[in-house]
């Protein structure tokens, strides 16, 4: 699904909030719960949650996503430190703008709001990126595969931005 819909928080009802938290926080936690003991027993495991760059720099129209994903990030920060001594790592990937259906839908909505054609909205969004382009799913997949490898046993509890340098902070 890619995440909850963008919008104004005043338009979301309680069910929208519960759905966002269920799909973007609780579901991840339940999956972790289902596999963590086996990983601990084997003394090896890699868990990578795909959240959002909005965890570091929330997007104004993505309040449902911002809140739910920040909750998951907080939970993982503590759990990763509990299981690290068992050879299990848990990290979060925080994607920025990658060429996905979700990004295209968000840009289409922005274009409609601004009264500009979709192609112009895409060009405007790419121009706002540091690299002048969006990330590819192949690039993102390679980073995820690396975090799942045996080479990353000393990386845990981290939030890795994969945003092409869009986030300007240093911490």
What are these regions (language model features)?
Residues 32-33, 77:
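A short, exposed helix-loop element centered on a Lys and neighboring polar residues
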